[in-house]
Amino acid sequence: MLRNCLRKLGNHQTKCSVKTLHTPIYRTKNLQVLRDTLSGIKLLEKIITSSSYNKTLIYEPKYKSKPQVVSSHDTMRLHNVMRELLDSLQVDEATNTRLQSNRPRKLGRVGLQLFMDCIQDNLTATSTSLTCSLLEHYFKYPEKEVTNGIKAGLRYIRDFLAKNKIIVKSQNDVDALVEQLTMSSSDSQSIKRVLKAINYELFSDDIVRVINGNKTYDEVDVSKGWKYPAGILDSNEAYLRSLELPTKKLVSIDKDMLVLMYDGTLRDANKILPTITYARKLRKSVLLIVNGDCTGDALTSVTINNNRNKRENNESRIVVLKYSKKANNDLAPQENLDFIKFLRLPCGYDSIYSPEYSPLVPSKMCADKYYGSIESIKATTGEAFLYNSIDAEAIPNKVPKSFLQNTVTLSIGGHNEIEIDRRRNAIDNCLNNVLCHGLAKGFIPGYGISLLKAIPGLNELKANEPNFMTKVGINAVLSAVILPSEVAFKNAYGYNYYEINSLIAGAINEKSFPMAKFSPNSEPVNTVKDGNLEPWSKMDSCLAGVETFIELLTSCNTIITCVYKKPERHKA
């Protein structure tokens, strides 16, 4: 598994194979090898802990000459910065032969890459500090039983948090959480507007899109109906221009439209011309959904019709969408009964026109057989929103109901691009990285408080364990779980060593799970009311990733690396 991870290094070619004597092979029985493997993660820990909890990180991007500032609230950009760091280490090693013989650097890069693959998108101060602390304890006692104790401790914490996670439903509690997560009142007000538009039902990260706006204030646009997982046909520039998509970026039709579903690839213009003529006379637009492609004379006729109607001030347009079986739960058009019902096709799946089997070409004469209807559409080349006033409960099958939802687009305003980018990243992180996961699966107290609450149970687990070395592993977990809180209290509040220890002891002794002190001279506060929460699913995935990495590294007895050639320059 380690070798597979190490071979994913772009276009650089391997100079040596495993069979040669020149390939660096390291035995993990030598603890210094494992310590070198951990060195890259320690560097990452310093970066993450110094830029977490209201801190900022200054870095120079790969393609920019000026330093950039990344806030601790912008976890997505922080993750990208770490990926750039890993890429730079790989490139430096491939282009510098001296670095290839530098064992600590090579192993540090290997460990860092493996850690990033295990932890995935849960790169936090918690994941790095736990990993470094637990492995340092393992290096002192490199026994399998110690690893078992570490795994038992981490699994106990995961079970404890799963049983005690907090479900937040009250709008007041959600608003308090938003106030805590945002940096300004304008950000919190925009987020509250979005939540109100979807009735505080933010259970997925694809419900709200946060984009750069072109005004000085924020705008909220709500798209209701069926979220169609494919956009307007984009294979022909002339067709896109006929819909004015390159300039307007969006096709929005708020009047009743005809709907025609076509099974197969539409090439022959004679199959669509009767529909074009019928729609032009009705001055209605047509939503044409093809299970294949639309090309040749048929697409040319559609383009000419759109341009002609635009010149004549006729509102009729032909909007072509491609049907994706994969994006519709692997259902063929004839099998997607919920979608057929939503489009109000008059004869169900018999209304899907097939040039091979249907006796009549769709036209005015057989309109009651083929044409459905929708009330409005908003579409780009990436996705579309179809709206019909239909009761969601009337749709029998449960799986496609995920397409029936309100989707909100929040356009971020500001006085310059820097302000807009900063606010967009922060708000997007708050909505789609924190709130959506927490509202869907539950919250736990933030600032590492939830890990402190598990300490009494870990002590009991340790006391009941008969094996001494397993106890050592559990004790390593007990020592590690206080580190995230130490970082949080120091960075967020600037407390000294004694104040931090006092707060940690108070959180451990407080029996109520959501209660904790955030100031040495104050009473315990409810983290739900105060808004100091974080998503349970994120912490659970973080602990699972740490456990996976530790198990992978401690169960491996050999690390095989590669020597890479410099990339050859191709002559023009």
Swiss-Prot record:
Protein origin, superkingdom: Eukaryota
Give ranges for the Mitochondrial intermembrane compartment.
489-572
| Keyword tags | ATP-binding, Chaperone, Membrane, Mitochondrion, Mitochondrion inner membrane, Nucleotide-binding, Stress response, Transit peptide, Transmembrane, Transmembrane helix
Q: Which terms does the record give in the GO molecular function aspect?
A: ATP binding; ATP-dependent protein folding chaperone; protein-folding chaperone binding; unfolded protein binding
Q: Which residues are connected by disulfide bridges in this protein?
A: none
- What residue ranges are annotated as transmembrane? 472-488
Q: Name one GO biological process term.
A: protein refolding
- The chain's Mitochondrial matrix topological domains, given as residue ranges, are 17-471
Transit peptide start-stop: 1-16
Q: Which GO terms describe its cellular component?
A: mitochondrial inner membrane; mitochondrial matrix; mitochondrion
Give the family per the record.
Belongs to the chaperonin (HSP60) family.
Cite the record's note on assembly.
Forms a high molecular mass protein complex of approximately 850 kDa.
| Protein name, entry field | Mitochondrial chaperone TCM62
Provenance organism: Saccharomyces cerevisiae (strain ATCC 204508 / S288c)
